[in-house]
Amino acid sequence: MVAAAKMRRAQDAIEAARPYAQHLDALIGSLQKNVDPVQNPVFADRPVERAVVVVVTADRGLCGGFNGSICRRVQSELDKYTDESLELITVGRKGYNYFNSRDYEVKQNFSDVFRDLEFSRASEIARSLTARFLSGEVDRVL
């Protein structure tokens, strides 16, 4: 009975994520047709003085090595930057807990994003990061 309830919740979560995936698919298709990478400032090649790393993990465990693998991979990427040139943003509680416990300064954390997954929330995060990149506040978003 408990397993059936968990399965149903997982199926509901997948259904809730479907509009997000459809928007993303449409966006990528539109970009491929309409964007000239040479003229678009998002694709500009510039020296990296300040980077933002966005870590997306789950809020809870029970997904095998998923969260740990992501965090270890990100940690190896963080070693390429100095503390002054790096900003760490986490989406999901597991990533926040991992980096916070290792004395990394997490500038921003988005927990419980997956509880009520909506395209508008993901879009808000992406718009904020894009605006910071285009304004020159940061030179790379990973």
Where are each of the predicted segments found?
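Conserved loop-to-helix interface motifs that mediate assembly, gating, or partner/ligand docking
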Residues: 1-142
